[in-house]
């Protein structure tokens, strides 16, 4: 909620048939947030589709239910989107999906934040730990980029993805 302060945005929460009182808690504590209560557990992807269909913004963020966004996350991402850096990373000046540096509850960087395509060779180097020896073997975790560096990657983890709504609907 604080991450959207000063930003014209909305929060849509999809509940996939929770058996606890989380929907009642959401209604009581966050009455301005749009809550969609599914009668059945349709799964994360279908829940995303339902939420995006209701969204009104130009950009959407797919966010795992256990992910916490820092207060400046969305303002930084929107600034990045509007900057010239986007053209550097996209060959045809069309923005794809933006991810961010993910950290765990202890504050440690999650290398899964950015990955390469797991070809048989790339998977082999990961399984046998070769990526720890040299960045030459670091394609699985896209080690061509440091944890604090922006750049193009093949795969983003689904815990946090920002994109134009139009792109998602394609």
Locate predicted features.
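Conserved donor NDP-sugar-binding/catalytic core segment of glycosyltransferases
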Residues: 71-112
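Short, acidic, metal-binding catalytic loop of nucleotide-sugar glycosyltransferases
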Residues: 1-8
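Aromatic-glycine-rich donor-binding/catalytic loop that engages nucleotide-sugar donors
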Residues: 142-170
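Short, flexible, basic/aromatic active-site loop/helix in glycosyltransferases
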Residues: 117-153
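A conserved acidic beta->alpha catalytic loop
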Residues: 15-24, 40
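Short aromatic/hydrophobic "clamp" motif used to bind/position activated sugar donors
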Residues: 60
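The conserved acidic donor/metal-binding loop of glycosyltransferases
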Residues: 64-68
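Glycine-rich, basic loop-to-helix element that forms the pyrophosphate-binding segment
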Residues: 37-55
